[in-house]
Amino acid sequence: MIYQQRNFNIHHIQTSPHKHCYGMGLGVIILDEQYPGFPGDTRNASAYPFPIQYEIAEGLDGKGLLFNADKTSYLAPIQKAAKKLEKIGCRAIAGECGYFAYFQKEIAGYVKVPVFMSSLLQVPLAQNLIGNNQVVGILVFSKNVLTSVHLEAVGIQPNSNYVIEGIMESGLCPEITNLYMASDPLSRGANYEKIEQELITLAVDFYQHHPQMGALLLECSGTQPFARSIQQAIRLPVFSWGTLLDYAYSVAVHREFYGHV
């Protein structure tokens, strides 16, 4: 298993006109603000078994991305970050926040590598896996700012088989809300066990209110470190940033198979 990413057939190398570095993995566009992330968060590279390169979308913070109605000025810094990641040699590009879904089509058309701007890209897949008699629960940071533009940009048909719950609007998750919304960036911090219990409580409540739920999708990258605990509590398939990034890398850099016959 240790050699799954090792290509034993490299006998010659040649300069590529499209990139500066080699052996790269995923490029992740991050917001221009400071907050910490537990292992599994998209801005914490330590938990992922493949290379991650970060680039900041300069001038774009989370509050702007979520709450500003006019997002036209954000496209240029996101495009700039995507182009830099492509130029350095990243095999695929992702966003760090699910609300980057707003720009999925624009960025996918701007670079020549696969683009995975939001974990919401997995909703249509989840819908197809569970059938029309069940719904996909979508747990987002704020449901009040998730629009049809976000949904349609990643292929989600409005009013199809999904239900949405917001972390902020629930009132059940003060610890993780403060991590991202505290006015002083240097005061931002969080306790792992507190967030874990908050998210479990919210997920269980969400499921109990929608017993027809057949899968859960986590939009917020900060919920990824707790995906396993959430799954153990509700016993459903869980789609997250972790499943998206694993998939993105497997598409861009296919592994070899070793075994015996």
Describe each region flagged by the PLM.
Residues 86-89, 127, 207-209:
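Non-catalytic positions within long, well-ordered alpha-helices that form the structural scaffold/packing
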Residues 187-228:
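Charge-patterned, long linear interaction tracts outside catalytic cores
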Residues 219, 223-225, 231, 239-261:
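C-terminal functional extensions of proteins
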Residues 1-75, 142-145, 151-191:
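N-terminal glycine-rich anion-binding loop in soluble enzyme alpha/beta folds
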Residues 67-81, 194-202:
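Glycine-rich, highly charged phosphate/nucleotide-binding loops
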Residues 72-81, 99-106, 110:
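N-terminal active-site wall of soluble small-molecule enzyme domains
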Residues 106-130, 232-249:
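Short, acidic/small-residue loops that bind anionic groups at enzyme active sites
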Residues 34, 92-104, 117-122, 141-146, ...:
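Gly/Ser/Thr-rich loops at beta-strand to alpha-helix junctions
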